[in-house]
UniProtKB/Swiss-Prot annotation:
Pfam families attached to this UniProt entry: Complex1_30kDa (PF00329)
Subunit field text: NDH-1 is composed of 14 different subunits. Subunits NuoB, C, D, E, F, and G constitute the peripheral sector of the complex.
GO MF, one annotated term: NADH dehydrogenase (ubiquinone) activity
Membrane topology: Peripheral membrane protein
Record-level GO cellular component terms: plasma membrane
Keywords: Cell inner membrane, Cell membrane, Membrane, NAD, Quinone, Translocase, Transport, Ubiquinone
Name of the coding gene: nuoC
Enzymatic reactions: a quinone + NADH + 5 H(+)(in) = a quinol + NAD(+) + 4 H(+)(out)
Compartments, as annotated in UniProt: Cell inner membrane
InterPro entries, per the entry: NADH_DH_suC, NADH_quin_OxRdtase_su_C/D-like, NADH_UbQ_OxRdtase_30kDa_su, NADH_UbQ_OxRdtase_CS
Listed name of the protein: NADH-quinone oxidoreductase subunit C
Amino acid sequence: MSDALRELGTHLELKRADCILSWDVTFGELNVDVAPSNLVDFVDFLRSDSSCRFSTLVDITAVDYPERAKRFDVVYHFLSMYQNQRIRLRVSIREDDMVPSITDVHPSANWFEREVFDMFGILFTGHPDLRRILTDYGFRGYPLRKDFPTTGYTEVRYDEAEKRVVYEPVSLVQEYRQFDFMSPWEGADYILPGDEKKEG
């Protein structure tokens, strides 16, 4: 399978060198890095080229790398049932960059792009209805960004007495611990009760 994917990667590089920044086969999967400006063209090529025929959009997601200048990777997964192959496209963007919508090529991208917008705050130009899909309309922030607080900003619950949904500030039962996820982990400097070793 890896040979077939390498062959496909070479074919794509020959046919669409203008779109591809780099490609590799890792863990039996073909990964292609594409510039945002060439994304729609390249996705259309993947669908229509007789050697590719990637007619099924499986998923769109994103990955947050806060330490990088190009903070987000928008990741597209496609399937060719005709060739029995999968491909992953990655588009790297800065926090305030926008990604062109592929809904004209794959209408099924509509809700995927809305989900990425809702969870990461990434905007898609040309999207027919870019609004939140999973969180409430008044929701503040983007929950899958690494700088989003683990507790969130508000607590949402149904109040039986008022017979409606109420929003309240988050109240934690235990003290909130702030973790620095951006620094390498060095281990805890303290011993919790029950962690001490018994003298034998």
